[in-house]
From Swiss-Prot:
It is found in: Cytoplasm. Belongs to the aspartate/ornithine carbamoyltransferase superfamily. OTCase family. Optimum pH is between 8.5 and 9. It catalyses: carbamoyl phosphate + L-ornithine = L-citrulline + phosphate + H(+). Homotrimer. Reversibly catalyzes the transfer of the carbamoyl group from carbamoyl phosphate (CP) to the N(epsilon) atom of ornithine (ORN) to produce L-citrulline, which is a substrate for argininosuccinate synthetase (ArgG) involved in the final step in arginine biosynthesis. This is Ornithine carbamoyltransferase, anabolic. L-ornithine binds at N162, D219, S223, M224. It comes from the Bacteria. The gene is argF. One of its GO terms (molecular function) is amino acid binding. It comes from Pseudomonas aeruginosa (strain ATCC 15692 / DSM 22644 / CIP 104116 / JCM 14847 / LMG 12228 / 1C / PRS 101 / PAO1). Carbamoyl phosphate binds at S53, T54, R55, T56, Q80, R104, H131, P132, C133, Q134, C259, L260, R287.
Amino acid sequence: MSVRHFLSFMDYSPEELIGLIRRGSELKDLRNRGVLYEPLKSRVLGMVFEKASTRTRLSFEAGMIQLGGQAIFLSPRDTQLGRGEPIGDSARVMSRMLDGVMIRTFAHATLTEFAAHSKVPVINGLSDDLHPCQLLADMQTFHEHRGSIQGKTVAWIGDGNNMCNSYIEAALKFDFQLRVACPEGYEPKAEFVALAGDRLRVVRDPREAVAGAHLVSTDVWASMGQEDEAAARIALFRPYQVNAALLDGAADDVLFMHCLPAHRGEEISEELLDDPRSVAWDQAENRLHAQKALLELLIEHAHYA
């Protein structure tokens, strides 16, 4: 059986993705009831971080421990990846010592190159193009609060970044309509727009995007690596702040999500995370449970003599 990776939602069928978020909720219930479940005993996940993170490291490391395994944190200072060793060579060596590798990186090509030479599953913990693990958590959170997202309308407000690209893939797999409100020149990548077809509508007015929407989501205006553009972006994106008044134009049962960390007073108003329509804290927690479902699926379970 060939090894499976998780680099993009497009690698999986809708049924598989729905199964993952349902399994995430089941594992969450086991955890909340104090049930010990350790199918990955003695398994080791390598976590390669070229980009810093709080939620990604915590959720994967805690997830592996809760499933009975272990996780090893590797920064660019800890590996030859940061000092010029060919990515394929690193993949060949690491996959002989580990049972899975999670990579949080800049260039998406780093992931595809690593996966092409790895004998163990490779998971996209984030790239400049996509953030599929976050979308698993988002879809699980919506399902827990509102049921199926099929046929619903989702609004993305702000930069057409990696999160926006992943929402496009989610729209195709989970069968919902996506509206993106962004300034001209900050649309999602053309390849994702083309992929979306009639599932996507790009508009300039955030009020148009949220009208009747069942889910509204946003992200920071300047992502990691864009610090030099931050001041200009803040000025340009100011009309795209998500606040209570904007949410009032959405569906009565709208949910608000933010992948965090949030810049209160910028992409969201100061109080929005505390609004009863916000499920950002559940969304953050579900990174743990959704990724445990993913680890359980991808990494070979322990065998007992």
